[in-house]
Amino acid sequence: MAVEKTNSSSSLAEVIDRILDKGIVVDAWVRVSLVGIELLAIEARIVIASVETYLKYAEAVGLTQSAAMPA
């Protein structure tokens, strides 16, 4: 996937539209420790996309077929 560069500025609506259209994944890992003692550890993976974008990629990797079958 190539990074597209533009010289024009984008409005907030255009940025949100692009994020929902393409999707974005934020992978975070935080560790808080004091004197070598780990107090807090947080791991998170946040996916932001429109339902249409999610379903398109979920279908491509076969996630929608297993969800459609009754247990």
Swiss-Prot record:
Keywords carried by this UniProt record: Gas vesicle
Conditions for induction: Constitutively transcribed when grown in a 12 hour light/dark regime at 2000 umol photon/m(2)/s; decreased light, growth at 38 degrees Celsius or both increased transcripts up to 23-fold.
Any Pfam family matching the protein: Gas_vesicle
Family: Belongs to the gas vesicle GvpA family.
Entries under PANTHER family matching the protein: GAS VESICLE PROTEIN A1, GAS VESICLE STRUCTURAL PROTEIN 2-RELATED
Assembly with partners or alone: The gas vesicle shell is 2 nm thick and consists of a single layer of this protein. It forms helical ribs nearly perpendicular to the long axis of the vesicle.
Name assigned to this protein: Gas vesicle protein A
Species annotation: Nostoc sp. (strain PCC 7120 / SAG 25.82 / UTEX 2576)
Highest classification ranks of the organism: Bacteria, Bacillati, Cyanobacteriota, Cyanophyceae, Nostocales
Gene of this entry: gvpA
